[in-house]
Each structure stands twice: as C-alpha cells, then as structure tokens.
Amino acid sequence: MPKTKFIIYKYSFLKEENLFTKKNDTKEEAINKALETFSSLFESKSLDVYQSKKDGTPCKYSNQIERTLDGVTYLRICDHIERTRVKDFKETLEDTEPFCAVVVDTRAGYEQIAIERKSDVFRGETDKIRNLLQDAFNRVLIRYGFKIAIKRKIKVTDFWHTVHEQVHKNKDTIRKIIIDFPDPDKNINLDTSPVMLDSLKLYSSIAKLTNANDCQILLSTTKDKTLTLQRAENDVTHIVDLCCRYGYNISVYFRQMGVYRSKEKMNACYWMEDDILTDFVNKNWLIMVRAIHLSSYGG
C-alpha cells in the first residue's frame, strides 16, 4: 500500500500581555483559552494564509479544510508557482498550485502538526509551510493575548533499530553506504581487535601517502538492487559499533528516506497510508513515544 512521508512538529502556546488578556488568569486557564481559540480556527472552510511580497502586496496560498474528527483536522495547502511555457515560439507564464496535506492534532497531550513532504510543493521544504501556518495562526491568536511556536520534533534513535525499521517496516532499500575510517594513532584508547586495528592503520597509511584529508570506504549497488546491512554480521556490527562509540561517521543512503548518519539526530517523521485522517487517529501516533521535543531546536 502506498505511503507518504510526513514531518512531525510540536506546538506550544506563549501568553502575551495585552489589552485582551486577563492578568489574573492561571497558567491552566490561559492554556485552555489558547486551545479553545486555536481549535476554533478549524471550524471554517479555510485558513487565511499569505506572505508579503517584496513590493508589500500579499501572496495568498489557497488551502482547504477537508475534515475534522475528534480534535484532529486534515487540510490541504497549495504552493503558488509560475512556470514558463513555450508554444508556437512564444513564451507564456502559467500558474500552477501543487498541494500537500497537513494534519493538525489539537488533542490534549498531543499538540502536534504533521506536514506532508512533497518535492514539488515548496521544494519539499516543510519548514516553509510551518512558517506560513505559524504566521496565519498568530495573526488570530495575538488578538486574544497568545502566540504559537511550532518546532520540529527530534526522534531519539538507535542505529540498528533505525536501519531495521526503515528496511523492514517502511520497505526502503539501501543504495549506498559510506564509512569514515579514523586514524588509530589519534585515538590511543580505540578498543578493537588486532585485525581491525591493522586494517585501520592500513587505511590511514594510504590516506597519508596520497595526502588525503580523510579516509572513507564507499559501498554501492545498482538501481535494481539493495545493500544488506544486518546486525548478525559480526564484522559489520563491529565497524558500526566503532563509529557510534568514538564519534566516527557511517552514512546509510536510503532511496526513500535519504541519508541517515550515525552521529545525527533525526527529525521525527511518520509514513501515512491511504486514508490519512483515519490512519492518523487509529494509530494514535505511536511515534510520539519515540520522539522528544527540544525547545532550542527549530523556530
């Protein structure tokens, strides 16, 4: 069954002191008021989403609220693109509005937004959609003394768990693996077997002889095949363990997911199947258990 990748964001409310805010409101009362105001935005047929052009005129982005169920709203938002077409030796500008899906979860304890990543919508940059929505929400919320901050969720990952989940659960394939090999002389505490240590010294020696800044090994395959990366293989497991423990890098290039590096934190994402809204509600966002929100990340 076809799946679509969504990037997960977490939102929170900030109380702004102004004429519309009661200063004696408790924190709980303020948050409840913010949630009530925010939820009411999705009772209409669309949101007021726009961005000012360089000349100051607004560029509006078409959107449509498709459905709301149990505090979860599914909407679609369009990009605005001008393309040049040539016909009969004449160039004409043509407007096109590719769209992507957005799911907003206002349920207590969830407070998150999922944005579909499509390469032809805002060039696949979901943060641009986040910024547009954040501005649209704040134009309304600020009247009631609130602002909303929407930030990416960061997924806490284990290397082998991530690879296994992507290959077996998401049916992804691996087209390339790049492993950075360290100079063993720079890390006297490198805990590895004599055979592995000799191999690392050989790679380091070749790098020095060729005046290379670093040493890597590249593993790749053809378009119709996939590389195998399994924990059962002792030598492979040992190499991955070295990379993870000592801060060296192993990069796995998936065909769908893109590159996953052992040293990097991952953005929380979710692969949705056909019925987007039902899938969202029924699966109850189990990914939430494996994700954390960093207040210093995103913006």
Mark where each language-model region is.
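Terminal interaction module
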Residues: 1-80, 120-299
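Long, hydrophobic/aromatic-enriched structural stretches that serve as scaffold segments
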Residues: 64-121
